[in-house]
Amino acid sequence: MPAVERNAPFTKTFIRKPGQRNDTSIPLHTEAPPPLRQPTRIARAKTLTRPERSQPQVPLINPSSGGPGFSAASRSKHRFSWWTAFSLFVTFWAPSPLLSSCCGLKDKQSRQAWREKVSLVFIAILLGGFIGFITMGLNAALCPSASSHSPNTYSRIGTGGAILGVHGWAFDIAQAHHLPEAPALFSLSTSRPGSDISSLFARSTSDQSPACRGTTAAYAADASCVALNGTLLKDCPLGPLSPATFAQYGMYNQTRKIGYGWEDVESANFSNFLVLDGVVLNMSPYLKANPSPIAADVVDLAIRQQLATSPHRGRDATITFYTNPTTRNAIKCLTQKYVAGYIDKITPGCFISNLVLYCSLVVILAIVLIRFFMAVWFAWFMAGRMSSPPRPSRRRRLAPNVLPEGAMISLNSSGAAPWANKQRPPPSQPARRRRDSAQSATPSVPDSLSVHHIGDEPYVVCLVTAYSENEEGISTTLTSLSETHYSDQRKLLFVVADGMVTGSGESMSTPDVCVSLLEADPRFGTPIPMSFVSIASGKKEHNMAMVYAGHYTRATGRRTPMVVVVKCGAPEEAADSKPGNRGKRDSQMILMNFFQRVTYNDRMTPLDYDLFRKVHTLMGVTPDFFELCLMVDADTMVYPKSMKTLTNCMMRDPMIMGACGETRIANKTQSWVTMIQVYEYFISHHQAKAFESVFGGVTCLPGCFSMYRIKARKQTDDDWVPIIVKPEVTREYSQSVVTTLHQKNLLLLGEDRFLTTTLLRTFPNRKMVFCPEARCKTEVPHTFKMLLSQRRRWINSTIHNLMELVLVRDLCGTFCFSMQFVVFMDLLGTAVLPISIALTYTLVVTYCLNPPHSFTEAIPLMLLVAVIGMPALLILLATRKVVYVLWMLIYLLALPVWNFVLPVYSFWHFDDFSWGETRKVEGEAKQTGHGDEGGSATGNAVPLRRWEDWERSRLRKKKREEKRRRELERQFGSGFHNDNASDGDPDRKEAGMPLSRPGSDSFSDSVTVSDFDDDKWGNQIGGYDETLPPPVQIVRHSVWIGDQEVIIDTEDMEKMLETGWDDKAFRARNLSSASSTNALLQAQQPQYPSAVNRNRLSQMGAFATKRDAPAVPEIPARYSMYVQNNGGGRPANGHGNSNGHYEPGSYEMERTPSPGEYASLIRGGAPSPCSPGFGPAQPYGHSSAVSGGAGQYSTGSHARQRSGGANAAYNQPHQHPPQPSQPPQPPQPAQPTRPGGAPAAPPRGAGSQGSGFAGARPSNPTGRGRSYHDRFS
């Protein structure tokens, strides 16, 4: 072959140049030989912690989305096809027509779920049968007692006392009497127990050795007696060998055989003993009777040769006798006539049986002991250090009232959200100009907030999911969270009401309860339903929710930011029994999806954007500052130190991604059902979770009280690692299409455990821990029916989650010394619970009737004592709470319930995916799952846009509304168009007059916007203006009447609410003091209503300020305008029509219905919501939370404030003009109301103050709202 030039064109190489990485190789023209690639270096150091060792996990629910590297289709087909085939094989006796006609399983999925349930029960029965056979039947099968040479039947030679052997059986002579040669026999039984004294009895061939009949050989005919000293006796001293003789002398047969070891047979004390087929023969009588060899006797020759030549072989003559036919025929006669005992041996069957028992003893005891000692270690050395405050660091705490750099909502130079650090290529010049027009006050690109700014108190969001809980339970939970030892500026209460539902026996719906506990922030106006993608299939994929924002003030001395998300459902499901209800997992995903989209700057739903605005306004920082999420159920009371303790755990170890505290029972003694749960709750935390926490692998964080890490900082403090918001986690946890029974048990029943399983599969190197210093209390089921329903869900979800967790190969440890093996043992133990308790009671009864006589027999009893006794010892060592020992005794009495009744019921209801009796809803007959729903998918109807796109649309909408307002004021003036200059308002501006409000460059009319492009997003953007500061005071206005003024006290108002608006009684009572009151009011009242309003209100009476009430400063114009800007109600002077114009003369006070009334309006045919901006009348006014919390800001009060000359104070928006007689009043928080408009109870510590209640017409001419008389009478 000819040589080839190295620099020929076809010899160009793409080998990468040495020493340079990430470099694209190019052809090299060189005379030098091509460079070799870098040598491969094998470095195995620390490979157990290298990230590349972790294998990517296949998605559990939807393997087709496994991503690159997976053969998803083949994996899914292989994984589910064999299970389907197995379920069909097991249930071959139940064809589909039979299931459809007899069992009511009409659809294919229900029949398949039933088949899978039967298959799982079949597997559980097989496992239970296997465990039962190992425990009770293995020894009987492999080592039967009839032919067993088990050590259990032996009395070993030389052991025990007062025992002698007769024909191989052990006889007790301790109580013997009248025994010949008694001193010698007692001495022999003491010095060498078990010695053979058969030669002292007269033996009959027909009775003792029937195999020797008809044989004349010397070995068969010999019947001589030999004394203890070896001399041949003429007569046998003990008489015939019979039961009568034993009874005469008081010798007791122990029914145990005399056992010899090989070392005993080889010793000098047994020189004339040999072994034949496992039987020890005492040949001393034969040799004494025949001292010389017998000629032509083959058997005699074999005996003498074996005794003389094979002492080192233990004198085993079995092979010698089986090689000759004559000696083989003599074996049976010899073993019957000269037997002295048996070789203490074990058969192969007995060996295998004992090996299995010993292995089970070692494994189970090892697990029990390791769990015990690890739990004690955790309680003594780890728990306190884990929950202690983090080490002093260089963190510089950020002042809560200082907005950090980058927290302001703005568009940065790259066009992305301010918290997104990823730089993009520079956009085109036109796009830059459009973006610059939407820039706000902070256009610079903010740096990410470092760990030194946040300090040791990270931002925590407290997720409270509510479904059918009552007001007391929800209020207790929120109060406990608010009163925790954690700054209100660093925690946010995030309440999600799962649908428009009312709990069983409750008079108020759950959303109304949640909203009534909120002191709404008036800046947000009336919430409107926002769309989002829910966890459901079909038509229920599209859902809507309203976001109420404000503060929780029921806690003593606290004012905690709070957000209430009410899932109200789409308009088309308003007629359903539970509009908006999608389950607890969907409520959790609202928060998880929100923070995921914030973290990744991903596209947001309208609900996400609304949440972003309100959370940012309440907290003063953008939501990306939140690092931790505390998930609490709505019936849980958190201890004051718990949140801080869990936060300390997270801050001390950045590898912790989840932590839970101890859950205690609040209603311990309510019933016997609650009493049997006390110890079960205690031991599940302080033993199971404590042991798992040592290795950082807690397999279940309870949903009632757990903290998760939203994202973790990298060690370099320059980037984040998403944890609970990682796409792999949220995608797995938000699956809505589930088809198999296994998937439905994972997602529909045990969402809390499944979330833990998903996190462990995704982050096997991170930790899940238990923090015993963090505690909470919750109410457990108090009836057996409720307990049965709850444990059915828990047991079934536990089995299916452990089935997935046992396949995770990256958990700590290896083989039997790994968390994977512990998970497997937990799975096996859960599956065999029914057979375990049955075997336990069988074992107890058996040992009571027949106590164990050996160590092997006592092995099952030792396991039982260890399993039951170790937790009791753990109580004393770890917690030193002796009272739990008493609770343990109650628990042991209920073991049949825990280990038999509940598991059997759960196994047979594998295909029941409802919540049963745990959460009952008023008027609901039977619960169903949230997953399947007919109809086409509606999730595509939800718009998804990036934050910057939503923000541009909001700013443009705000400019359009400001432009429209300015146009209206040019036409009608700054007042109202039905007022005139003679109404007494000195600050009134006529139509066309210049405005008293200063101009704003940001709202310039010259700004060009695309109305068509942005108007379509108007319904998805709230019409409020969160940039306004909150009102500093509740303003109470007096209302003037044309001729006479009346003073209304608080008691009079309460009577009015009860009896209606017939005020003749107290009008007459207060008439005498009217004149003096007029003078006082005229001196104190700086503002007065217009003439039109005064004439309008004089028809029904009104309120005046109390005689001794201090003067109220006027409200700044910028505060009084928020109702119009928000579009929170009808125009102040009347109702709007379809053209956007106002109809004067019809004054009406109106509020927005509460969440419960919103569903009723939709059912009644109310129009769907239109743009919430200033303009035509909206079907949504102020909510019940807003109307009560800021009643003075309702439409009517806004009208009086505007006509009272509030514009005069616009130039001084942050200052109130001093009053001549009274000093300015301090700020007062808004008072919440209960849904329906009734005033709520004031917060703790709040006194009864004068109300800012305003009057309204008793009639309702339009029918679109309700008067106060209609609402409160």
UniProtKB/Swiss-Prot annotation:
It comes from Mycosarcoma maydis. Glycans are attached at N412, N667, N796. Residues 101-117, 382-820, 879-881 are extracellular. The keyword Transferase applies. Residues 1000-1009, 1233-1246 have a biased composition (Low complexity). Residues 1-69, 416-451, 966-1009, 1126-1273 are annotated as: Disordered. Residues 1215-1232 have a biased composition (Pro residues). Belongs to the chitin synthase family. Class IV subfamily. One of its GO terms (cellular component) is cytoplasmic vesicle membrane. Pfam families: Chitin_synth_2 (PF03142), CHS4 (PF22997). It is an enzyme of class 2 (transferase). It catalyses: [(1->4)-N-acetyl-beta-D-glucosaminyl](n) + UDP-N-acetyl-alpha-D-glucosamine = [(1->4)-N-acetyl-beta-D-glucosaminyl](n+1) + UDP + H(+). InterPro entries: Chitin_synth, CHS4-like_dom, Nucleotide-diphossugar_trans. The chain crosses the membrane at residues 80-100, 118-138, 361-381, 821-841, 858-878, 882-902. The keyword Manganese does not apply. One of its GO terms (molecular function) is chitin synthase activity. It comes from the Eukaryota. This is Chitin synthase 7. Induction: Expression is down-regulated in the mycelium and shows a maximal expression in the log phase at about 14-18 h of incubation. Shows a late increase in transcription at the stationary phase in both yeast and mycelial cells. Highly expressed during the stage of white tumors of plant infection. One of its GO terms (biological process) is chitin biosynthetic process. Polymerizes chitin, a structural polymer of the cell wall and septum, by transferring the sugar moiety of UDP-GlcNAc to the non-reducing end of the growing chitin polymer. It is found in: Cell membrane; Cytoplasmic vesicle membrane. CDD domains: Chitin_synth_C (cd04190).
